[in-house]
Amino acid sequence: MLLNKARAYEYMDRNGLDALVAQMSINVYYLSDYWGSLNWPGFFDGTYFAILPRREDAPASLVIPSFAIRRLASEGGTWMPNVFSYSTPEEGATLDDDTPAGLDYEGWPLRPGVPLTAREQSWVDITRRLRDQMSADAVWAVVRALRAAGLEGKRLGCDDERTGAWLAGRGFDARCEYRRDVFNQVRLVKTPREV
């Protein structure tokens, strides 16, 4: 794990934050151990997110686009227990939590009876697990992740100034603070895996 959790918790405590919300590629990678295929600085902003709650019993979450589901399996996954994904909005459809749904994601077509390698089977398995829980877009997936961690109405340290406006636009109540400094302070002390 790249993340120094103890240091992250220490800096959240020092700054009165209930969670860290990463959108910058390097911070998403640092928090989640997942590097997406579109995770390049300055490109495809708002494609991937990682949420690290301060409460240790609240689930951390990774948000990825539907086409990245198979890559998540190929790259060894993430230590984060929750993965929220998104696809194209499905007109008028909602998920169980009343947020707008995306179209179910089926992945690549699969011919019946064809033997699969272990890697191919892992792609099928993760697609089946996540396919019918697609959010309508990335921000709705972030809202779902934050709600799952009980972070509504809480103070969030964000590494992108736009995150608060994106969440407010979805009616999510939280105090979003631009706190790239906290991310930088946490990352100053390297974990053995980083070195």
Predicted regions mapped to residue ranges:
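A composition/biophysics-driven feature that prefers long, compositionally simple stretches
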Residues: 1-195
